[in-house]
Amino acid sequence: RGLGDVYKRQALLFAAALTAQAQQGGISGEMLNQIKQSYKATPADKAIRNALGGTSINTLALNQENRADFDTEFSHKVLSKGITDQQSSGRCWLFTGLNVLRSQMIAKYGLDEMEFSQNYCFFYDQLEKANLFLQGIIDTSGKPMDDKMVEWLFKHPLSDGGQFTGVSDIIEKYGLVPKSAMVETFSSENTGKMSSLIGLKLKEFGLQLREAAATGAKPAELEKKKTEMLGTVYRMLVLTLGEPVSTFTWSLKGGEAKEYTPVSFYKEFLGNDLTNNYVMLMNDPSREFYKCYEIDFDRHRYDGKNWTYVNLPIEDIKEIAIASIKDSTM
């Protein structure tokens, strides 16, 4: 028997295997043939395939004719002095919050430009979220692994996303620094890989904490282990984002340079009580309007505030947004 017979037998076995799978909802050989035959290799398909082979789908999907249709003229503008770019990161919430403060400082001191370090705030955001996870694991160590809260914790050990409560909680505790004091890095602009690696390490730590608690570790021992684990997370953050400054020298244009800590800098130039002077407004049609809602354990700091918002109709939010823009307060 030649190789041809061997290949035929293998093909028959493959088809038989596919047929067996079909009995359990799989793709049979007959079904696979129908699927293959349904594809018609048209000249247009060939052109699309060649284009997709070397070009991003997002680039190809852009309608070039629409690029000139955007009207960039506005009746009112906020004194932002340029844009800020979150790059390929999930820090939209942080950029938005810092832009509110940025416009206030530009207007207050008549600055030509100003930008706060998003990287500085993000560093402590990730460290605080790591602690939030680990402490959550300690708090639920007496519950089974299939408990809904435990399951949720291990599914969401760390993220780069957030909302304004996180901005206020991080700044309240750690202050602010100018962007020049802690610049962006590749990982701060591309947060996905860094956050996923730290998340994997946190899951490992979470299992270790649960095991320690199950074998009788006292609260003080668990606290010690958690602190050591956060030391590892801190090192990972330093390697990817850089180490946050504790002091720096800065001055307003034409002013005398002074040394600041991040907290003293924030208090001197802004000093706004973000925790008590601001409230999140949201439009959630699935819940009753004109009420305040709080999402449990959805926060950035263990000792911080939960995601809390006032639910308003979209018409009310539009009016407030317009008034804010006109007042240049964002």
Residue ranges and their predicted role:
Residues 15-17:
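N-terminal signal peptide c-region/cleavage motif recognized by signal peptidases
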Residues 8, 21-22:
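Solvent-exposed, well-ordered amphipathic alpha-helical segments
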